[in-house]
């Protein structure tokens, strides 16, 4: 298990160094994205002025407060609570995020499916997991909301955060076919089969 300090944008070679159970801490730029954002971009053809190539995105729709624009709050938004949402709803967007936008890292909770794992392997990407219920802690890692695009979708806008020490995050899916979710599922199925056999129950 290795630890990595990364400052996006990162290269394919860097993301392929990551292995399941490694930890990653991010510095610099992090983009916030959610269901409506990706529907707008990939289903409805809306463009963004942000270059996501080599970057990390986090599945979030942050709670923010409108304030006067200043050096501290350049967009006129102050972060209140920036937490992570469940990723599984956005499974179908993993491949286009990597293939069309050049995203390298996806941060979320709960994991993604086999289609995403295949995309990570083919295109060079990884999924970094956050434990649910840590939004207050995550918010302390965000120094500022630097910019926002597609803001008519608020709060599911496309956010550009400046982060410091964002992590450690666990590499839960890597570009080599590794997935803690697949491993847990296989282990649970094995234990279920053993328990049923011990009870004399035939598994269906």
Regions found by a protein language model. Name each.
Residues 1-10:
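Short, structured beta-strand/loop micro-motifs enriched in basic residues and often containing a Trp
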Residues 12-17:
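Short, surface-exposed secondary-structure edge patches
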């Amino acid at each position: 298990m290795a630890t990595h300090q990364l400052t996006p944008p990162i290269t394919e070679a860097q993301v392929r160094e990551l292995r399941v159970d490694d930890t990653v801490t991010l510095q610099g730029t992090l983009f916030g994205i959610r269901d409506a954002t990706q529907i707008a971009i990939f289903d409805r053809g809306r463009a963004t002025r942000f270059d996501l190539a080599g970057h990390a995105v986090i599945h979030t729709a942050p709670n923010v407060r409108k304030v006067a624009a200043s050096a501290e709050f350049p967009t006129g938004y102050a972060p209140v609570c920036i937490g992570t949402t469940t990723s599984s709803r956005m499974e179908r967007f993993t491949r286009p995020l990597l293939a069309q936008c050049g995203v390298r890292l996806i941060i979320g909770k709960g994991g993604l499916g086999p289609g995403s794992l295949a995309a990570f392997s083919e295109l060079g990407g990884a999924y970094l997991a956050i434990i649910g219920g840590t939004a207050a802690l995550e918010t302390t890692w965000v120094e500022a909301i630097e910019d926002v695009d597609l803001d008519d979708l608020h709060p599911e806008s496309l956010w550009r955060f400046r982060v410091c020490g964002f992590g450690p995050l666990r590499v839960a899916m890597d570009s080599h076919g590794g997935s803690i979710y697949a491993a847990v599922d296989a282990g649970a199925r094995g234990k279920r089969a053993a328990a049923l056999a011990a009870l004399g129950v035939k598994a269906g």
